[in-house]
From Swiss-Prot:
Mg(2+) 2 binds at residues 10, 134. It comes from Neisseria meningitidis serogroup A / serotype 4A (strain DSM 15465 / Z2491). The keyword Metal-binding applies. Mg(2+) 1 binds at residues 10, 48, 70. This is Ribonuclease HI. One of its GO terms (cellular component) is cytoplasm. Residues 1-142 form the RNase H type-1 domain.
């Protein structure tokens, strides 16, 4: 039986670049798990990507995964842009190197292990799970600020 896991992810950055954190609320049925971490010198986009990566890395077996993020950057990157980047040797349409390609490549490999769908949620709009992911990301950032 294929399990459905919800990953609510968020990233935070104090300064951009600066101290940053990532947070994940994982939900499978009635089970929940919280993950968070951070880095001393990073960007908000790197933390958004890292949140999804860490959530996927924590899954022990193949799952149906619904990723709920407030990051259009992450959602658009995985649903639209990544195909062209890979085709163009990790260059943008303007022939520039893709920013954060190390994380995009890792995320792409992890997504390939699961059946993943992407959902965008408006950040800071009272979405309970997104607010929890945001709190976790801020806890991760606080370790370095």
């Amino acid at each position: 039986m294929n399990q459905t896991v919800y990953l609510y992810t968020d990233g935070a950055c104090k300064g951009n670049p600066g101290a940053g954190g990532w947070g994940v609320l994982m939900r499978y049925g009635s089970h929940e798990k919280e993950l968070f971490g951070g880095e001393a010198q990073t960007t908000n986009n790197r933390m958004e990507l890292t949140a999804v990566i860490e959530g996927l890395k924590s899954l022990k077996r193949r799952c149906t995964v619904i990723i709920c993020t407030d990051s259009q950057y992450v959602k658009n990157g995985m649903e639209n842009w990544i195909h062209g980047w890979k085709r163009n040797g990790w260059k943008t349409a303007a022939k520039q190197p893709v920013k954060n390609d190390d994380l995009w490549k890792e995320l792409d490999a992890l997504v390939g292990r699961h059946q993943v769908s992407w959902t965008w949620v408006k950040g800071h709009a009272g979405h309970a799970e997104n607010e929890r992911a945001d709190d976790l990301a801020n806890r991760g950032a606080a370790q370095f600020s």
